[in-house]
Amino acid sequence: MGFANLEDLLAIEKEIKWEDRDLPSTLFGLLSRTANSFPNRPAVSYQILSGPKDKAETLTWSELQTKTVQAANMFRSLGVGSEDVVAYILPNANETVLTLLGGAIAGIANPINPLLDPEQIGAILRETNAKVVVTMKAFPKSDVPQKAAKA
């Protein structure tokens, strides 16, 4: 059943209470269920360069789940607990998705806009009391790692 307006949506929501729907209650549960249901289906895709020989890197749902668990385990091994912040200053990339999901599963994910000035980045890191900061290695035409180091 589709919907075209708010009234349609409200009618759909009245059919079954949210609590009675068979939905995962956590991000990890949602990721696991999707990976089990559609393991080989593409989940995320990113292409860093656009040359004729460059190809996108695509992760299936199974790969996304596996790598997300690895990221969450890494953050936990660094001492991240459920109330700790994993900040990241990253461009769009598959690694960014893994950091977001793994950080949210291990603790609290805090994306920081890489276009901000180092002073602003530093203020956010102090305000959130980030336990871990994830950024990228040096990359041509990008000053993200330098900004993160300066912050």
Named regions from a protein language model:
Residues N40-A93, V97-L100, D117-G122:
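Conserved AMP-binding/adenylate-forming core of the ANL superfamily
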Residues R76, L100-G107, R126-E127:
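Short hydrophobic alpha-helices that are characteristic scaffold elements of the AMP-binding
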Residues G107-A151:
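Structural core segment of the AMP-binding/adenylate-forming
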Residues G2, D22-Q47, T66:
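A short N-terminal helical cap/helix-turn-helix that marks the beginning
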Residues V86, G103, V133:
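Conserved S/T- and glycine-rich ATP-binding loop of Class I adenylate-forming
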Residues K17-W18, S50, A138-K141:
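Short histidine/acidic/glycine/proline-rich micro-motifs that form metal-
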Residues D8-K17:
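Short, contiguous pre-domain boundary segments
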Residues L31, L98-T99, A148:
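Aromatic/hydrophobic pocket-lining residues that form π-stacking "cages" and hydrophobic walls in ligand
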